[in-house]
Swiss-Prot record:
UniProt name for this protein: Uncharacterized oxidoreductase YhxC
Amino-acid positions noted as binding NADP(+) in the UniProt annotation, renumbered to this chain: 45-69
Top EC class, one word: oxidoreductase
Organism this protein belongs to: Bacillus subtilis (strain 168)
Keywords: Oxidoreductase
Region (Disordered): 1-25
Xref: Gene3D superfamilies: NAD(P)-binding Rossmann-like Domain
UniProt superkingdom: Bacteria
Active-site residue numbers: 190 (proton acceptor)
GO molecular function: oxidoreductase activity, acting on CH-OH group of donors
Lineage: Bacteria, Bacillati, Bacillota, Bacilli, Bacillales
Pfam families in the record: adh_short_C2
Similarity comment: Belongs to the short-chain dehydrogenases/reductases (SDR) family.
Enzyme Commission (EC) number: 1.-.-.-
Binding site for substrate: 177
Amino acid sequence: MANQKKKTLPPQHQNQQPGFEYLMDPRPVFDKPKKAKKLEGKTAIITGGDSGIGRAVSVLFAKEGANVVIVYLNEHQDAEETKQYVEKEGVKCLLIAGDVGDEAFCNDVVGQASQVFPSIDILVNNAAEQHVQPSIEKITSHQLIRTFQTNIFSMFYLTKAVLPHLKKGSSIINTASITAYKGNKTLIDYSATKGAIVTFTRSLSQSLVQQGIRVNAVAPGPIWTPLIPASFAAKDVEVFGSDVPMERPGQPVEVAPSYLYLASDDSTYVTGQTIHVNGGTIVNG
């Protein structure tokens, strides 16, 4: 049948967000062997760093010489596994579990990180949640508030908390999404938060440019992370990513280099921008 979607993954579903990487089939690809020490001696705070894109970024940053603070909700097994990969690179890794939608917790994250490490140089605001609903009428007030707290309020909280520790040359990187540009009829609230993240990135970059702090975003397309089986029905997971020009989902390891570019001195003339890693979809944004 002409309109039948290409199967890209085994059907599967998880009943808890943001999902568990160790339960996924196949496991997401998050590691490559090459390293150049572009982040030697720096420290990065990465929310959602236990799995998915956050794990790939954590491991890549470690390969490049950065100490890593991984902030995650409650996926302890994934977090411990990621910590092992990070520390295998000869750097330090601090795990902090909690809800980034809570401002007090975000303040505590920065407090703990500043006690363990001599500097904080990079903030990766990556944690997110999404809940599929067939229409706006099905989005409860609780879901709406929760999605905004996790996806965008957390970025305000952590940025405010970490800003006194950042110095010239520091970098803030926010995870947006292709949904900020294309929309998604079953992820209305999630897409709205991602649109807010793009504007937050642009506005904050203008606010901090005179301090020498760069602010950018990465807008992934369909990437194989635990959030996918934790969000979508098994039949939808089976064809996940088949609707982009490359006809497959991306792997976290294919997104992580964008974060490294924005965190390193390779991008010293880049701020307020969004990098699109989406399998070929043209968004002109």
